[in-house]
Every structure is written in C-alpha cells, then in structure tokens.
C-alpha cells in the first residue's frame, strides 16, 4: 500500500503538469499547450484518477482537488478513497500521508525537473526534455504525446487530450507499463493565493528528506 501511495503521489505531480487552457478550437493540441505555457499562470479544479496494470488489474479510483501557480507551486489534495496531500511552495515538494503519519520532502527540481511537470512548471521549452508529437483526434479530444528524452524519467510517455480550450484527460504510461488516466473538470484559470502553497508538517509525524 505504501508503494502504491508513493506511486500515486508521483503521478499526481505528473497530472498537474499537463493542465492547460487554450486558444480557439481550430488550434492544434500543440498550439493550445504552447499558448497555455505562455499565458496561464495559475488555476484550480477537480480531478479523478484511475490506474490499470498491464494485466488489467485496477487500483482504487482517486478523486480530489488541485491548484497551481507557476513557476513551481502546486497543491494536489486527494480526498477519496484516502486522504493524501502534495504541496509545492516553489522550492520544496511535500507529500503528506496522514494515516502513515509521514511527510516526504523533495526539492522541486528533483521532483519535477525531468517529469511531465515540466510541461506546467517549466519555461515552456518542451523540446529540451521531451519529444513532442501530434496524435489523431480521439474521444472528441485533440491529443499530443510527450516522450521524455531522459531514459531515467520513470515513465515512457504522457498523452494530453484537450477540448473546448481546456485539458480534459491525461494518460500516462509509467516504467512498469501501468496506465494512469486523469480526468480533469471545473478548471478555472486565475491567480491562486500564496497561502494555498504553504505547508508545515504536523507535530509528531516522520519527516523524510529525499
């Protein structure tokens, strides 16, 4: 269970990475993402996340809310089926598992520098970290695929589907062949208060610095 939660936390970072707002519907997915990187500085919304193994086994569906503010700040709050909180203040990323009484702390560059989070929190030069290509339209969405140039990234590809000037779905295939699908909803672009990204570990919990 602990390994599953650690993986879920990493995938949460991946998921926040691809949140986007886009120009006119006629624009390609790549153009929409480019516009997002250049113009959308922050947003809030809701998510639902499910993971399927190569053998078809499923993990419990997660749901919750998120917020982000570039560069490098985000909050990913899992509410169901168990609580988990991931917060970045722009310098450090805190992952808090209440029932494990543990907080894991990583530097932002370590946590998102070579992950799909660079799509959201980076400077927009995706070609440096990813090989980006267009995909055929599917399920009423316009798609692009980002493959990491770093073989140690921990995932093989992330597909991003956009609709009505907003991201609708993210599909990530990790190094073990698991596919994680994140459905996004209620996306509201706009500035997010800095207080949303502040986190102090509760007294009595184990703090593990990576």
Swiss-Prot record:
Signal sequence, start to end: 1-26
Source taxon at top rank: Bacteria
Subcellular location(s) per record: Periplasm
Subunit annotation: Monomer.
Function: Participates in the translocation of lipoproteins from the inner membrane to the outer membrane. Only forms a complex with a lipoprotein if the residue after the N-terminal Cys is not an aspartate (The Asp acts as a targeting signal to indicate that the lipoprotein should stay in the inner membrane).
HAMAP family reported for this sequence: LolA (MF_00240)
Entry protein name: Outer-membrane lipoprotein carrier protein
């Amino acid at each position: 269970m602990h390994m599953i939660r650690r993986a879920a936390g990493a995938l949460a970072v991946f998921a926040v990475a691809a949140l986007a707002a886009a120009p006119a519907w006629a624009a390609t997915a790549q153009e929409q993402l480019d516009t997002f990187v250049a113009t959308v500085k922050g947003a809030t919304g809701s998510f639902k996340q499910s993971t399927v193994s190569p053998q078809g086994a499923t993990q419990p569906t997660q749901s919750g809310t998120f917020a982000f503010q570039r560069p490098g700040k985000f909050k990913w709050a899992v509410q169901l089926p168990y609580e988990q909180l991931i917060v970045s203040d722009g310098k450090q990323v805190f992952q808090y598992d209440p029932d494990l009484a543990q907080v894991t702390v990583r530097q932002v560059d370590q946590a998102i520098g070579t992950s799909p989070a660079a799509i959201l929190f980076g400077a927009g030069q995706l070609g440096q970290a990813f090989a980006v290509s267009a995909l055929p339209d599917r399920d009423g969405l316009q798609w692009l695929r980002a493959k990491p140039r770093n073989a140690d990234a921990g995932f093989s590809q992330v597909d991003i589907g956009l609709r009505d000037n907003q991201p609708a779905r993210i599909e990530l295939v990790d190094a073990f062949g698991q596919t994680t699908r994140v459905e996004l909803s209620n996306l509201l672009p706009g500035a997010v208060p800095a207080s949303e990204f502040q986190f102090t570990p509760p007294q009595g919990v184990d703090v593990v610095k990576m």
